[in-house]
């Protein structure tokens, strides 16, 4: 979950 960008699944 990134902020400001496209939400990527953070592990």
UniProtKB/Swiss-Prot annotation:
Residues where Threonine amide is found = 11
Where it mainly occurs, coarsely classed, is secreted
Quote the InterPro entries the UniProt record gives. Periviscerokinin
Name a biological process GO annotation: neuropeptide signaling pathway
Subcellular location(s): the record lists: Secreted
Q: Which UniProt keywords apply?
A: Amidation, Neuropeptide, Secreted
Entry comment describing in which tissues the protein is expressed = Expressed in abdominal perisympathetic organs and abdominal ganglia.
Q: Which GO terms describe its cellular component?
A: extracellular region
Q: Which domain of life is it from?
A: Eukaryota
Its biological purpose is as follows: Mediates visceral muscle contractile activity (myotropic activity).
Name the family the entry cites.
Belongs to the periviscerokinin family.
Q: What is the recorded name of this protein?
A: Periviscerokinin-3
UniProt organism field:
Derocalymma versicolor (Cockroach)
